[in-house]
């Protein structure tokens, strides 16, 4: 799948957390541990992010959850050697995006992550080289309207990911 993403010009994955990376909707109020939440990571998403990191693609988790410390701990448990490479943008009040881009949906989260990656790694990321994977149709629509590639993740159909990636190459 990574080869297909690279062939489509994708170098940055922005992935939603609730109901996309994990199979639960925490509503930003998970009271359990990161280890307990780790059991809810979808195998296909775990592998996609592992492969993306191995291929030196940029990765961010973009979420409306304010529980970014918990999400950071989940990424540390998932990828102990590479978790620090994953940017996390949630509604925790710890970041600000003041650019000219869209403020709808996950767009400011993505733009803020791109700013950090550009400063920290001299990353060359554009809207066309970005892929949002999210289970929320409105977030997907907001991305597409703004020229960002997007795949609507269907929680009960994990193969939608492979089909979505294949469709990127056809566009």
Residues covered by each model-derived region:
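Active-site neighborhood of HAD-like aspartate-dependent phosphohydrolases
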Residues: 1-58
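Extended hydrophobic secondary-structure segments that form protein cores and membrane-embedded regions
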Residues: 13, 88-90, 129-135
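Short catalytic/ligand-binding loop motif for oxyanion handling, primarily in non-cytosolic enzymes
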Residues: 22-23, 55, 68-72, 96-97, ...
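Glycine-rich, phosphate-binding/catalytic loops in enzymes
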Residues: 30-33, 77-79, 148-150
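Short beta->alpha linker loops
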Residues: 44, 65-66, 105, 135, ...
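Substrate-recognition element of Asp-dependent hydrolases with the DxDx(T/V) motif
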Residues: 45-75, 89-91
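Substrate-recognition "cap/lid" segment bordering the active-site pocket of phosphatases
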Residues: 67-128
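Acidic, Mg2+-coordinating phosphoryl-transfer loop and its flanking beta/alpha structural elements
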Residues: 127-171
